[in-house]
A protein has these predicted regions:
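Extended, compositionally biased flexible segments
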Residues: 1-77, 226, 251, 257, ...
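Catalytic-pocket segment enriched in acidic/His residues
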Residues: 2-18, 35, 41, 110-268
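Short gly/pro-enriched beta-turn/loop segments at secondary-structure junctions
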Residues: 20-21, 73-76, 95-98, 116, ...
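Extended boundary segments
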Residues: 27-32, 106-107, 124-163, 289-318, ...
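Short acidic/polar capping segments at secondary-structure boundaries
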Residues: 31-33, 54-56, 84-87, 104-110, ...
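Short, structured patches in soluble enzyme cores that scaffold and shape functional sites
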Residues: 51, 76-78, 82-84, 102-107, ...
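Generic secondary-structure signature for well-ordered alpha-helical cores
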Residues: 54, 85-87, 103, 137, ...
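N-terminal accessory regions of nucleic-acid-interacting proteins
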Residues: 87-101
């Protein structure tokens, strides 16, 4: 963000329209059903990360996509501004501690996401990565379950959802956070983004609006406007990790493999009931003979026996390969929750784990 202007009162314009610079900005990873369905996972509980207050920006500013990066994505969100201190409050009393709501854009740079491992310090903490405003809506005047958030990119509607689709109501989020630390006046809570988030490029104009169309007067935040520009500065690999992307990151940033210009994933093999029944009737020696006829001489299953003589195991196989213990790779490969444990946890009905040691 390049806008360092100040208001007529000598205040930093980055924090307009907030009453003061917030002590903390707390953001939620996944909170909308539509976004969770798009990602293919639904969290049982909310999880959070912090954003620095230096990432705030006013409406009408710009955001730089750093040199050497490609996956800057927008996320339109409802922002809650804390009015009175909240510590260990109940869900029933939680909304009373919110002074106002407004629009926010939780920009993120997917090129740095893997390096942050969920903390989002670098991928979402850059200057100008949290535009907010332009107007505050009195929290007393709206139903927190009936707010709408919309996003336009170059005038085209890209996100459109309401807080009725939240997995975790605002009251739960406020109460949950307050049991861990004090929410102080001026703190900002970014409440997550619905489906539709995608990548923007230099020259794009992103607009976010939060409103309450069913409330008296249909109060609105107005449109929060941000223009994407190309930054001149990249990152120094001698100081820290460099941006890195793969097709998985591209698909998540754009919203789908198709939107990212990638080939679709191949259709997974399906072991149908008819094929399972046929395999159960086929002698093991016969299957091995068929494999050899196809030139697969090193995958014979002759001699494989179930622990129970009357049983016959038929399923889709996954291979779990054990390698020599490498302490230096322990942390980078999942730490205590390593590939072995993940494989055993993920096995489902009709699947077989083949252990190669």
């Amino acid at each position: 963000m390049t806008d360092d202007s100040t208001t007529g009162q000598g205040e930093d314009a980055r924090f307009s329209p907030l009453p003061a610079r917030p002590g903390k900005i707390v953001a939620i990873h996944l909170s909308y059903a539509s976004r969770s369905d798009q990602r293919g996972r639904r969290p049982a509980h909310p999880s959070y990360f912090f954003k620095p207050s230096s990432s705030l920006a006013p409406s009408g500013g710009t955001i730089e996509r750093p040199a050497g990066t490609e996956l800057l994505a927008f996320e339109g969100e409802v922002a809650l501004v804390v009015g009175t201190a909240a510590r260990r409050v109940s869900p029933e009393a939680a909304w009373d501690h919110i002074a106002s709501v407004t629009a926010a854009n939780d920009f993120g740079l997917y090129d740095l996401r893997a390096n942050d491992k969920g903390s989002n310090v670098r991928s979402k903490g850059g200057d100008g990565f949290t535009p907010l405003g332009p107007e505050l809506i009195d929290a007393r005047s709206v139903d927190p379950a009936a707010l709408r958030v919309r996003v336009w990119v170059n005038g085209e509607l890209r996100q459109d959802d309401t807080t009725a689709g939240l997995l975790f109501p605002f009251a739960q989020v406020i109460a949950d956070l307050s049991q861990h630390f004090t929410l102080e006046p001026g703190d900002v809570i970014l409440t997550g983004t619905p489906a539709g988030s995608s990548v923007v490029v230099p020259g794009d104009v992103v607009e976010v609006e939060v409103d309450a169309p069913g409330a008296p007067g249909a109060p609105s935040s107005g449109r929060l406007v941000t223009t994407v520009t190309q930054g001149e500065h990249g990152f120094d690999g001698s100081l820290g990790s460099l941006p890195a992307v793969d097709d998985t990151q591209r698909a998540e940033a754009w919203g789908s493999r198709e939107a990212a210009g990638l080939d679709p994933e191949p259709e997974p093999f399906v072991l149908t009931p008819a094929l399972r029944a046929k395999l159960e009737r086929t002698p093991v020696a016969g299957i091995s003979a068929q494999l050899r006829k196809r030139g697969l001489n090193n995958v014979s299953i002759d001699g494989v026996r179930p622990m129970h003589p009357e049983a016959k195991v038929v399923g889709t196989a996954r291979t779990l390969r054990f390698v020599p213990n490498r302490e230096d790779l322990f942390r980078s490969h999942g730490g205590g929750y390593n590939a072995q444990k993940r494989a055993f946890d993920a096995v489902g009905e009709g699947e077989v784990i083949v252990i190669e040691a």
